[in-house]
Every structure is written in structure tokens, then in C-alpha cells.
Amino acid sequence: MKQRSICPGRLSTAIAVALCCFPPFSSGQESPGTIYQFNDGFIVGSREKVDPSRFSTSAISEGVYSLDVYTNGEWKGRYDLKITAGKDGKMGVCYTKAMLMQYGISPEKLNPQLSEKEGFCGRLQEWRHEDNVKDTLIQSSLRLDIAVPQIYEDQRLKNFVSPQFWDKGVAALNLGWMANAWNSHISSANGSDNSSAYLGVNAGLSWDGWLLKHIGNLNWQQQQGKAHWNSNQTYLQRPIPQINSIVSGGQIFTNGEFFDTIGLRGVNLATDDNMFPDGMRSYAPEIRDVAQSNALATVRQGSNIIYQTTVPPGPFTLQDVYPSGYGSDLEVSVKEGDGSVEVFSVPYASVAQLLRPGMTRYALSAGKVDDSSLRNKPMLYQGTWQHGLNNLFTGYTGVTGFDDYQAFLLGTGMNTGIGALSFDVTHTRLKSDTLDEHGQSYRATFNRMFTETQTSIVLAAYRYSTKGYYNLNDALYAVDQEKNYNSNYTVWRQKNGMTFTVNQNLPDGWGGFYLCGRVADYWNRSGTEKQYQFSYNNMYGRLSWSVDAQRVYTPDSSGHRRDDRVSLNFSYPLWFGENRTANLTSNTAFNNSRFASSQIGVNGSLDSENNLNYGVSTTTATGRQHDVALNGSYRTPWTTLNGSYSQGEGYRQSGVGASGTLIAHQHGVVFSPETGPTMALIEAKDAAGVMLPGSPGTRIDSNGYAILPYLRPYRINSVEIDPKGSNDDVAFGSTVAQVVPWEGSVVKVSFDTTLQNNITLRARQANGLPLPFAATIFGPSGKEIGVVGQGSMMFISDASAPKATVKWSGGQCSVELSQEKTKETLCR
């Protein structure tokens, strides 16, 4: 653990020397009251001037101690452990089989016979007679270190902490927000002004493990003349660690792993994979495209806007988009400064789902359909269940439906030598006033990582065998159309569909490529939709370059309309002195084999913490159109500000934005430029200016608080503060802490601080001899306030004390501290 001395300056050196005299105690080597004899001949100088007696006696004794337990360096929690003396008089920890399992150790592997005992007190080596099996008690930090070979660890519990150490957090409001304002002016014969504003809110009120969550946005369009609030989700949730599940009620979404993701006003109970040891994690797609100017990128899932941001000219990648569920494609729109809009979809399908043997995953949902585009909103139910049968097979099943529709699914996942496979069959029945259809759908998925060639393949294929098959979403729209005589939309029922993704890392120097695609046709529509995307990237020295290509086939009355887009991108790092870096970028785009645009620009940061960023670019487009674009962002201690401006022939665009987080807690309000669902509230009183290495640019505020985002729920998170920037008179008990938060919680991490008025003073005994090295200094109240260092230098942490007493074995003396501190004085 990284620590800062309680007395800054040279006092830290003295204390470091003193602390090194405290030995770690092996549980198999220490006995109570052990006397340690120090050879003071190793200390340079006169031996009678050294007093190591204070470090000569072990304070360890039999009893119960609250100790932090580490297995092979990994924290496993703080436990109350009984320490007792064995027959040989040596100290040992009392273990049980259950305790070792909590520490991530397999008792059966360590010693099958001894593991049957109720309990055992002694050295861990007595469980396994090997030199590399040992336990060491470090008394100075109340820590038990256990070291065992990896073969004796329970790998299922790697990086896992017992739920009893999960932190529910404090009562707090976590309000994340993002605001954008956008204006576009077109100066032509039919010129127009187009303005819009957007405020996105992701708020969570947490207390005692409960979380009241609201996700919504406020949209204002100049043409509409009024603002509209869109509530995407409002729900109350509670983790249930006893069954590794989470329950929620309100505006929720069904799990789209096997059926379509549907919004409900209802309740949901489902397994939370985050509560299990590290394994498969939820998947979120990357969204890639190229903007021709400062553009507004909007991501929709179904009828809901789930993400919106401003992107600068050139290639961009959105990696922080988190869809609901697993099975609904995303629609992305990119609105350029001149008013043009590009719309494309991003395939979003689950890969083959495999579970460990004996592991079960389930999801239960029920409620009223919540979809603003539907008039008919029936009550809907859904349930899915998966179970790991053995190392080869995982079985799964599911059911969903409403009054006029039912669907049943049965499938299996297989872990084979050629990759992860799954196959399932879904039978549906749709029976309403005018519809009576039934059919089947057969689905196969494949996932494989070829380690030899570093090739990753994800393939999801769907085949609808009969014309009467309706998926859940199609059925809802078909019934809504029937009951409301609404013909504004058509239900296209998919017949065959396939999506695939290939990632390939090539040998050194050859870069890598990414390929994805989607193919689909429909029973009630002629032609086939096809969409392919390819990206290749590489480096030549410091020059990064890539080629992106996209081809889209869209059925129309004449057959197929083909749209091609190709872009060539370059980036070269520049250097303008310390803390000032920049990248020279270039992008050239072609549409349908014709030149579309060429853009060149510079972007970078003006400080070492990337708080102040900028971008400048110029673009030449088809028809001799030219524009210039500027954008920048500034991360303050409270929020992140951004702005953009571009102007071209016949138009100009401007935009401003801000984002951040507000945490309201019992003792006040804290602001942060970062956002996140699970956060730490850092408390370090009188430590304004202290930095958080895990969040560049974030510092403790004047009230002694700061926010650290991006904590992993149910996992160990190390929280660190850097004393740099604090007052020299502030002493820290420690600068590193560990916490395991509940999902959506705000956990409080307090660092002990002490305000001190430190002084140094050289003093000698009345006989002229120096004070003994390492002698202890006490104040008038008897409290220890310092230590004697080399050269008879007194390091004192309380300058307000009028008098100090120096004690060592065999003597003591006193010093009046009110006299001149800069001169040598006598200790009488």
C-alpha cells in the first residue's frame, strides 16, 4: 500500500527507519512474548546513543484479530480470525474448510484428508508439506498473507470477493447529464434556420441497496416550437446477492437474448451475471462512420433515442453506447452541418450462449407493453431459462406472448472443437380477429476465436421455415394494425437473415482488418437487403492509416439500389513542446466510385492531463464546396464543456454542449466532469487539491470531496489519491483503499487526514551527548508526537506543544519548545 508519512519532510525518513524494525510475523514461527535482540553494531556511531528497545518485543498474543486476508496478493476481505499458540508454543491461525474456500483455496486439493476436519489451528504448511505453501501475519498492517501454488487455488473464485464484503454505498443522488444545443443556417433562395436542443439525464437515487433509476431526455426542435420530455426508463431495482439476481419494477426492458427486446411497464426478476466470478460479460457493439463536418450523431433502439453526441469531421467510433437487452438492431443517424442526414443500421445480435456445468441463468418479466409507436399495448409475459448441463452442452428454453400471440423456444448450446455453436427452434401462434397464423423459426449461431491466426468470427444465422411465423415485435405491430386500422406502416416479416463479424489481426507490420455484414429477405417483400462493412488499419512508422468501405443493397421497384462508400484515413502525431501534442489527420471519401470530399485537420491537447482539447479542419466536397470547422472541449473540475463551429458555401453551423455528474449526499453536493453508473465518493478532509490518479484532472474540492467514476460492481476496485498538490501540513494515514460496490451505488471512501504543524529541532543532553537515535518524543498529555532521528535531530508533529519529553531505555529529558527553534538547545 502506498502511504504518506504523518510527518512530512525529514521526519518521514526517520519513521521509515523505525518501521523497518517491525518484522512480519509468520504464523508458524512466532510465539507470544518473543524477545528480539537487535545487533546495534550495524548502526553507525556510538552504540549507547541508539535506543532500539522499543522494537524488541513482539506485541502479538493469543486472541481474535480483524485481519485483511490476501491470497497470492489478491484481497479476499477482512475477517475476524482466531490466533492461538500450538503445542510447540508457536502462533498459528485457526482455519476451517469454509474459511479456506472463502479465501479462494480448494481444501480438497490442499489436503483431502485434513479438509474433513471441523477446524485446524496451526501453520498452513501442516495442511500441505511444501515450502511454497505458507501463511504470514504482518502485525503492523493487520494483514494475513497466504501463498499457495496456483494448482491449489479454486479458479472459479479468481478475482472474486465474498458477497458479505460488497458495499451497498451511502444514500445519494447520482445525476449524470449531457446537454447540447445545435443551430444550422442555410443561406439560399429558400434559406432556413434550424435549431435544436437536447438534454439527456441518467439519474439514480440509491439508499441501502435500493436504486431508483430514471433515464430520459428533453428534445426541442425549432420547427415544432415546443420541448418534449421522453422518459426511456424509470424503475426501482434491488440486487439480491443470495440468489445472484436483481429485481426491478417500472419502465423496464425484456431480455432480448432469445426473443425481441420489448419495453414494458412491469416487473422483472433475472440473474445478474456481474455477481458471478469473472466470465462472460455483456456485449455492446462499436459504431463506426465518417463525418463530413461537425455532425450530430444519434443512436436509436426501436423508437427510443439511447445516445446522442456531436462528432468532429473525419472518422469516428462510438464505444460507449449501451443498448437494452441483446436482440434489437441499432439505427444510427448522422446529421451534417449543411442539413444532410445519413442513416444506417448496426447489427446487434447475441453470440452463442454457453454456461459452466451446473450454472443456471433465468429471466422473468411481466407487464404492459410500453412503446410510443403502438396504440394497442397488451399485457405481455416472458420467461427464459438456461442451464449448463456439462462441459459440452447448455440447454435453454423460453416462452413469451400476449392475448393474441404465443411463442415457445427450445435450444441447446454446444462447446465443440470447431467453436461455440447453438441451435434453437421457436414455434409461434398468432390468432386474432382476422389473423390465424402459426410457424417455426430455426436459428443457428457460431462463435470462434482462432488463436493461431488471431481470427475472431461471430456468425448468427436465422431461417424462417414457414410463412406463418411472426416474431414478437412483428406480432405486436400486426395486431396493432388490425385493431386500429392503421396502415401507416407495414410489417415486413423476415424469411432468411444472416449477420456476421470477422476480426483479424495480421502478423507484425501488416495491421488488421474488420469485416461485418447483414443479409435479409422477407416473405412479403421482393428482393434482398445486403449491407457489408470492411475496415483495414495499419501503421507506417508513426503514421497510422486505414481504409473503410461500405456497400448497401436496398430493394426498390427497379430491383436493387446499390450505395458504396469508401474512405481513406491518415493520422500523424505532431509535437509542439512539453504537454502540447497534436495529430495531423486526413480523410478522403468516395461515394459510388465518385469523389465526395477531402478533409484535412489538426487536433490535440494543450495540457498533460488532456483537459483542454481542440480541433481545426477544412473540407473540400463535390461541386467545389469548401468549409472550415472548429471544435474544442475543456474539462473543468465540475463539468466538461464543448463547442463547435463550421462554415461553408451557403451554410454555417454552431453548437455548444456540456456534460457531467452531480452527487448529492448527506454532507453536501459534489460535481464531476465524468459520468458513470457506479461511483466512489472520496472524502479527504483538509486535502483540497489532492489528485485522483484514476481520473485525470479530478481533484479533492475545498469541502474535502471528489468523485471517482467507472467502478466495477461486485469487484475489487483500488481507489488511490496522490498527495501532490495538498498542503504540506496535511498528513495521510494511507493513500490507497479498496472497495467492492453494489451496482448503481455511491460508495464512500474516507482517507484519514490530520492537520499538523511540524517542526524540527536539534537538541543534546545536558552532558553534551546527542540524544539516542529512535528515542520517542511525547507531548505534555503523554501522547507520542515525534521521534529522534540521526544527528540528534528531533522531528515533532505538534509545534503548539509548549514542552516535549524524550524517553529512551535508561533515561529521559525534557525540552522547552517555546524557545528559538532554529538553534541547538538542551534537553534537561
From Swiss-Prot:
Residues 1-18 form the signal peptide. Pfam families: PapC_C (PF13953), PapC_N (PF13954), Usher (PF00577). GO terms for molecular function: fimbrial usher porin activity. InterPro entries: Fimb_usher (IPR000015), Fimbrial_membr_usher_CS (IPR018030), FimD_plug_dom (IPR042186), PapC-like_C (IPR025949), PapC-like_C_sf (IPR043142), PapC_N (IPR025885), PapC_N_sf (IPR037224). GO terms for cellular component: cell outer membrane. It is found in: Cell outer membrane. GO terms for biological process: pilus assembly. Its main location: membrane. It comes from the Bacteria. The keyword Acyltransferase does not apply. It is a multi-pass membrane protein. Keywords: Cell outer membrane, Disulfide bond, Fimbrium biogenesis, Membrane, Signal, Transmembrane, Transmembrane beta strand, Transport. Disulfide bonds join 813-827. The keyword Transcription does not apply. Involved in the export and assembly of the type 3 fimbrial subunit (MrkA). Belongs to the fimbrial export usher family. This is Outer membrane usher protein MrkC. It comes from Klebsiella pneumoniae. The gene is mrkC.
